[in-house]
């Protein structure tokens, strides 16, 4: 309700003042998992997506603020945290030093030993950094599940979508991660029926 909203948000905040938005969600009653958004917006212009026009370019929550919010969730009793973002693997491109997602995850796991499990939301195959790949092998707390924003398994359709990866890139990532940690399972976002997609294009996705 309007009254409930005003209880948490009583100050006008511009859309891009991401760091000033109060973190009101701190109670997932009777849950062991909580979600922590660390990134918003997107710098890319995929032909099927309106997010950049609705949420603006990518911007990231500073590591110190992520750590503070994470600690609050742990104090509240949560055992598993899912890091989320519109374009999660672009994290840090707008911050000083451009810290990569893998580096941030490594720091969070080091700073918060009480964290039992860490999970990632959907990530872009074109931006997975090498340190993140290595963490799947070295960090047991990083859960063995990865959801990729694949969209299509056909290179022509990917080009028309203005995606930055190819079919071969995705298969390489699958193979590389499985080589580091065989138990990792994968999920994917897939768009079916994209304009000009034929049965042959669709078979390449299957």
Task: Place the predicted regions along the sequence by residue.
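Conserved SAM/AdoMet-binding glycine-rich loop
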Residues: 75-202
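Proteins enriched for Cys/Gly/acidic motifs involved in redox and nucleic-acid/cofactor modification
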Residues: 1-91, 131, 142, 146, ...
């Amino acid at each position: 309700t309007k009254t409930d909203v005003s209880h948490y948000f009583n100050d006008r905040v511009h859309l891009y003042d991401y760091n000033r938005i109060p973190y009101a969600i701190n109670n997932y009653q009777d849950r062991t998992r909580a979600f922590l958004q660390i990134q918003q917006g997107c710098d890319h212009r995929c032909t099927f997506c309106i997010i950049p026009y609705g949420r603006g370019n990518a911007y990231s929550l500073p590591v110190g603020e992520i750590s503070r919010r994470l600690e609050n969730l742990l104090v509240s009793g949560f055992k598993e945290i899912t890091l989320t973002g519109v374009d999660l693997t672009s994290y840090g491109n707008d911050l000083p030093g451009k810290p990569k997602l893998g580096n941030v995850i490594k720091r969070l796991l080091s700073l918060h030993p009480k964290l039992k499990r860490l999970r990632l939301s959907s990530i872009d195959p074109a931006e997975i950094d090498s340190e993140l790949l290595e963490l799947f092998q070295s960090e047991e707390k990083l859960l063995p599940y990865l959801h990729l924003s694949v969209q299509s398994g056909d290179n022509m359709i990917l080009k028309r979508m203005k995606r930055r990866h190819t079919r071969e890139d995705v298969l390489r990532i699958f193979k590389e991660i499985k080589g580091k940690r065989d138990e990792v399972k994968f999920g994917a976002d897939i768009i079916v029926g994209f304009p000009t997609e034929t049965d042959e294009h669709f078979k390449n996705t299957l």
